[in-house]
Amino acid sequence: MKKILMLLMLLPAILMVAACENPDTKDKVVIDFWHMSPVGSPTFSKMRAIVNEFNNSQDKYFVKGTGFSFWDYWDKISLAISARTAPDLGLSTIDDVYGRAKGGVLYNISEMIAADTSENNIDLDEFRESQKQFARYEGDLYALPFTSTARVLYYNLDILAEKGFTEADVPTTWSELKTFAKHFDVVEGGDIQRLGFDPTYGNATYHGWLWQTGEDFFDEDLNPTLNTETHEFVLQWIKDFNSEFSRAQLQTFGESNNMLGIDPFAAERVAMIVNDDGLNQKIVDAGGTFNYGVAPIPIPDEDGIRVNWGSGFSIELYDNGKNDLARKEASFEFLKYLMSEETQIKLAEANGWIMSHISAMEKYTADKPLLAKILVEVDYAMDKVYVPYAPSWHGNDWQPFYTEALEGKKTVKQALADARAHYIQKKQNWEATN
């Protein structure tokens, strides 16, 4: 009797162990791949199918795919890299590959490509040099461009039609943008119900607007260039765009959008917005029924430059210091599969992203007019420079000063001066210890 009771007590543990033994992995090299399609997401089943196709195509390797939500992913991968427990393959941001490569946590992909004599090696000519340059460290590639993000101006055709406008009327310059946007503002009882446009919404950024003037946030020596007339002009233009509204009105409207939990353009609360290719998929996933289009982001009236912030994802092979050559080999084989023309098309279909493979995306967008327009803007996309003393220079470092200027707590000139002093101090502190 005691033996029977003991067996019954142990049975759950026995079943659990048995369940964990996957017969598909027997005698195979098992590697981990982290992505952004978690269980329950609209993209999960398609991403799983892509991984399974590789696993079923050969009997030497087995890839375990794990998906995290976009926001959870960054904390997970950052902690894993720091702890040297990173997956064999994962996604990151391409414009800061330099820091990870210098830190010794990435495998040298150039060496792996050079050593590969197979017929399915990676064709580097299929990836844009404008992205590959950010994936290099000391001349070699330590990552590959995974997506080719571009930012464009989305416009709601139904809202435009309310005022008798069509695609032919979509603005191309900053002055046209402001004049056009004012046709679509709706205010009821002192509360904003709809905005034509706001230069801080969506994926619009200060440095993105600045680049259109031909100026950058840093000079060639990575000193901040915040004390110029151009900076003052750009920041003042952003601040004044909706100056007929109080900051309280704009904040209330912005907060109400956040409470809805969806993009304000997808919710039809703004007529136009700057965003990336991902917004199109969000609208599709949300079941949006309104008509919309995309166009290049309007540029300054005088000497404006057609440029947008890319900020695409990189794909990286992580070196956790274990010298596991079998897993390294398996990771490279899976990388070749992911970067092939056929798989890049499937990844675009799964995620709604513009992927990095040039020929693949030309084929994928051939019968998709809106995505084809976004793909054109990829050739005008650029990434932000990596600044070792301020890796988050566009985010946590800049945002407090930007907000103070927008809220009127500081003048544009003072906010820029304080921001410049902040970066200079960070640079001095970094140089003193590096």
How would you describe each model-predicted region?
Residues K178-H183, D221-E255:
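Glycine-centered hinge/linker elements that transmit conformational signals in sensory
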Residues Y137-F146, R151, S175-T225, V270:
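Extracytoplasmic/periplasmic solute-binding protein
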Residues A18-V105, A115-I122, E167, G254, ...:
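Conserved N-terminal structural module of periplasmic/extracytoplasmic solute-binding proteins
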Residues N52, N56-S57, K163, S243-R247, ...:
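Extracytoplasmic/periplasmic substrate-recognition and gating elements
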Residues S69, I94-V152, K178, W209, ...:
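Hinge/lid segment of periplasmic solute-binding proteins
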Residues C20, D125-E126, A295, A348-N396, ...:
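Long, aromatic- and glycine/proline-rich binding clefts that accommodate carbohydrate-like moieties
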Residues G67-K76, T172-K178, Q251-A266:
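Short helix-initiation/N-cap motifs at beta->coil->alpha
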Residues S110-F127, V170, V187-F197, E215-L235, ...:
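Short, solvent-exposed loop/beta-turn-alpha elements that line the ligand-binding surface or hinge
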